[in-house]
A protein has these predicted regions:
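Conserved, single-site charged/polar hotspot
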Residues: 2-398
Length: 398
């Protein structure tokens, strides 16, 4: 009997030490599924450190110059010409080829590369890396820059934020830009380019400085994720008191990092409150150019305001009746530098509409003026990231 009891005790001890559950409810192992990211967001798989950016789209011609050694090649990397200091030349599409100055290359795509780190100038703006000139079916030109992501991030940070702002604000902005860039690169991996000039403010090398390059290097390769998926880390100038849920503005699926937060830090911005008088005829002309038929506007109002009072839609009442359209679409048509945000109240005043609103930009993600205030108060860049993108995680991808 003693031997049997000893064996039973030994079996029980082995079971507990192995973590085996002995209750009837737990005798079947539970299969834990890997959390799935929201629809539309993508896992990080592409760790290549280059990105393609459309810097000129559908142009009749552009001006090209290279301040140093250069090569002109076709898509198969065959060198068609090389030399030193390519003088400023007009580039256009010409009879089934691409003409640079007085010479026509019978190809529909050319790659211009600086061989000694010189700048490639397009329309007098300096760029890095490699520039692709691409003929489109309508005989217009696309100009695409291919460069290192970190160089692109530096150029965007210097274009999006004043150079004299706080280091920690710049570092937070760099992480947001890199995350957005990697997301777009993954989402558009099969396209000719990953981003265009409407995605982010970008002025090539003109946005760079040694200080900004050093700050960007502090966060090199770091991006934000949620549930293991990279997401579009939107940012804007000033939210006016509360950032918006991404689903409210862009119809992307809502996730905690983009669900909106109270912002206590941009109230002193000159964009916290604003007022604009815009001619009704100007608004009507811009809407008609986008095939939105309106005449004699009587009233404009936002519908379905979000946490930050940014409207989801806009109702326009005119002589022809009532029309609705996306609030962000309306703002972009009128002019994003004229109509600062979609968080506004509009009043008809004779020939004008008076818009009174809060904030500058779409209101999603990082509030740049809020980030600057946080940095001045002593917050570090990870604090800023955690504040504006709650529950996000930092991952180094390269």
């Amino acid at each position: 009997m003693g031997r049997i009891l000893f064996l039973i005790f030994a079996v029980l001890l082995l079971a507990f030490s192995s973590g085996v559950h002995l209750s009837c409810q737990n005798d079947i192992p539970v299969q834990h599924e890997k959390p799935q990211g929201p629809r539309g967001f993508v896992p990080i798989a592409d760790k290549e450190s280059t990105v393609r950016v459309l810097i000129v789209g559908s142009a009749q011609d552009v001006l090209l110059a290279v301040n140093g050694g250069y090569q002109i090649a076709d898509t198969a990397s065959n060198i068609l010409e090389q030399g030193q200091l390519l003088a400023r030349s007009k580039v256009s599409v010409d009879y089934g080829g691409i003409r640079i100055g007085g010479k026509c290359y019978k190809v529909n795509e050319l790659r211009i590369k600086s061989t000694r780190d010189g700048a490639i100038e397009i329309n007098n703006v300096p760029y890095r890396g490699c520039v692709c000139l691409s003929q489109q079916p309508d005989n217009k030109l696309f100009v695409i820059e291919e460069m290192e992501i970190e160089d692109f991030v530096t150029g965007v940070v210097g274009s999006e934020m004043p150079h004299l702002w706080n280091d920690e604000a710049h570092c937070a902005q760099a992480v947001a830009v890199r995350t957005y860039t990697m997301y777009k690169k993954k989402a558009r991996r099969s396209e000719k380019y990953h981003l265009d000039m409407q995605d982010l403010a970008y002025r090539g090398m003109a946005g760079e400085s040694p200080r900004l390059s050093s700050l960007v290097q502090k966060t090199k390769g770091l991006v934000m994720t949620y549930n293991g998926n990279i997401f579009p880390a939107y940012f804007h100038s000033a939210c006016g008191g509360h950032t918006e849920d991404v689903s409210h503005v862009f119809r992307d699926e809502s996730i905690p990092p983009l669900s909106g937060v109270v912002c206590k830090y941009c109230g002193n911005s000159k964009y916290a409150k604003w007022k604009r008088d815009i001619s009704k005829s100007v608004i009507e002309r811009k809407l008609r150019a986008a095939n939105v038929a309106v005449s004699n506007i009587r009233s404009i109002k936002t519908l379905d305001p979000g946490y930050g009072n940014h409207g989801s839609r806009v109702e326009i009442v005119s002589a022809g009746g009532s029309k609705e359209m996306g609030a962000n679409d309306f703002r972009l048509l009128v002019g994003p530098n004229i109509l600062c945000s979609t968080a506004f109240i509009a009043k008809s005043s004779g020939k004008n509409i008076t818009f009174s609103g809060n904030g500058w930009g779409h209101g999603v993600g990082l509030c740049q003026h809020g980030a600057q205030t946080m940095a001045k108060k002593g917050f570090k860049w990870p604090d800023i990231i955690n504040y504006y993108y709650p529950k996000s995680e930092l991952v180094r991808v390269y």
